[in-house]
Amino acid sequence: MPPPSDIVKVAIEWPGANAQLLEIDQKRPLASIIKEVCDGWSLPNPEYYTLRYADGPQLYITEQTRSDIKNGTILQLAISPSRAARQLMERTQSSNMETRLDAMKELAKLSADVTFATEFINMDGIIVLTRLVESGTKLLSHYSEMLAFTLTAFLELMDHGIVSWDMVSITFIKQIAGYVSQPMVDVSILQRSLAILESMVLNSQSLYQKIAEEITVGQLISHLQVSNQEIQTYAIALINALFLKAPEDKRQDMANAFAQKHLRSIILNHVIRGNRPIKTEMAHQLYVLQVLTFNLLEERMMTKMDPNDQAQRDIIFELRRIAFDAESDPSNAPGSGTEKRKAMYTKDYKMLGFTNHINPAMDFTQTPPGMLALDNMLYLAKVHQDTYIRIVLENSSREDKHECPFGRSAIELTKMLCEILQVGELPNEGRNDYHPMFFTHDRAFEELFGICIQLLNKTWKEMRATAEDFNKVMQVVREQITRALPSKPNSLDQFKSKLRSLSYSEILRLRQSERMSQDDFQSPPIVELREKIQPEILELIKQQRLNRLCEGSSFRKIGNRRRQERFWYCRLALNHKVLHYGDLDDNPQGEVTFESLQEKTPVADIKAIVTGKDCPHMKEKSALKQNKEVLELAFSILYDPDETLNFIAPNKYEYCIWIDGLSALLGKDMSSELTKSDLDTLLSMEMKLRLLDLENIQIPEAPPPIPKEPSSYDFVYHYG
């Protein structure tokens, strides 16, 4: 007979003694269990002790976390967190450097435990650590190693969010900033210093001001030219944090400073085009920098043109002058009157494609795109003058009904690009889709506009469009751009080539192909056949998911970015009635046997499956402090009485497999993206196989009519 669910069998170790094999009743108070363990070894004062895990990060066990103890777990009897904190507090201030170094090593390890961290912080432990850093006594032996452990402990303690970052002194900030600015500083010290500064900036506006005064752009950029991608990532993360928290009136100054120090080209050459693959966290930081850079355009995008502002009107005059040359300026003509000049201006503004021919300034009063559209037009006219003049003159010489209005097109195109690139929106925590081509030019948005306005003009000609077709052309251009961007061209020239291949005829072909594929499967007979086949396909997918669960998968345990990963394995019994699981020393290369998995949970006890932020192990820390992909890969099984089994899938595929399989076990619909994809693929294949004999045969919308009954049934023969 299996033991009750409240009883867990564990081994408890104590240095110099034989391990105790104990059955722990989870309903008993933890203090009572600790007393029983101490009595087994004749240890006095059981209140001085506690239990913690023997493996991994060796976390302390509390009344709140004791439910995580599983059968077969090896525990240690250890001194209580309060005593450990007190002893480490004394040892970290010892005059013996070896003692102090050992204490710092242990402190850096224990600080990841929130139970210990709370005790240590309550003893003003953070103040002690900051003073040790502030003293900066470099003459001490093991200085670099000791400092690295001190900064690690400080960062771990602050990560728990128990105390505010505002308690940090200006002296401490100067000291940490000094490690970032010093040449040839130890890599581990530099990494932790960058991480501490980033956390300070993100968590405190007042600290942002102080750090911005201490750290220069040049100091951070120098760390991007190293070969260590982790240091590069932390440096860009700090740059992004400073950029994000800077007041709006300071952001443009920061961008100018970055441009002067060639930040973009350094990132391009040393990070994007480096010899190492871009890791997920680096890709996210590059995406954030890309978004923050484009967000500098928001002010101009939301600024309306003032029709009475002469400086702004002069820009429109400049556009006209460049397009039609100063020689044609009516003000230069002898005896030119005001009315004649106005008529000439109106004619020119019409040829420039403005909607309001008399006062084109009114075209820029809509936001978005506001003044940003005028900025783009002026950039094109001055930097790519030949292209600008060609587009304007080419359209002004066409028949009226086929001319592409440059002014209106430029305004709508600018608005479209702002929508596609989401100018003005904050970075998304879960995204990492940066575009390398935007790091190849200091004026990437303006260059992108220049490429796309030529695309628009080309597409207009290919469509033989008229003014009535303007919106249709813009829809095609949007489709061309959005189809080209996912290929992530490495340069603007590659992007231009990709757009060239997506001509109007190619877009029509793609649309037709997609529409035909869709239409083929929308006729009533096909829909009826599809509905008949779908349950069979879903059952096939369900069996595949359950078979994968029976094979099992390895999962990593939740951990801090500075801790070594630990793994556990879970697989479904062949009769689909029990989940077997257990801890592993390493990530397994093959299948793990049922016999080696000590724990099990009956499927009948499962109450629900939760995902993402609803998971208990995701609520311990905020999403900002988690790895960017963890939330999307997390799920938990809630089972009787009030237990949880927490998972972090190794990838999105395994996540979908397990969510589908567990849903199928509970009799629920499989709703993952993978199921939808598999269903579409398998249904499409099955439908095509069944319809092979009907190739080139028109399938009628309705079944053929039933013929009338014959006048007699004399043709019927009855077999005797």
Curated annotation (Swiss-Prot):
Q: Where does it sit, as one GO cellular component term?
A: cytosol
The UniProt keywords, alphabetically, are:
Apoptosis, Cytoplasm, Membrane, Phagocytosis, Phosphoprotein, SH3-binding
Per its record, how is this protein called by name?
Engulfment and cell motility protein 2
Please spell out the taxonomic lineage of the organism that makes this protein: Eukaryota, Metazoa, Chordata, Craniata, Vertebrata
Q: Which residues form a coiled coil?
A: none
Q: Where is this motif: SH3-binding?
A: 700-707
* GO biological process per UniProt: actin filament organization; apoptotic process; cell chemotaxis; phagocytosis
| Residue ranges of every copy of the ELMO domain listed in the record | 310-484
In the UniProt record, the signal sequence range is none
Q: Which organism is it from?
A: Pongo abelii (Sumatran orangutan)
Q: Where is the PH domain?
A: 553-674
Domain of life, per lineage: Eukaryota
Q: Which residues carry this modification: Phosphoserine?
A: 503
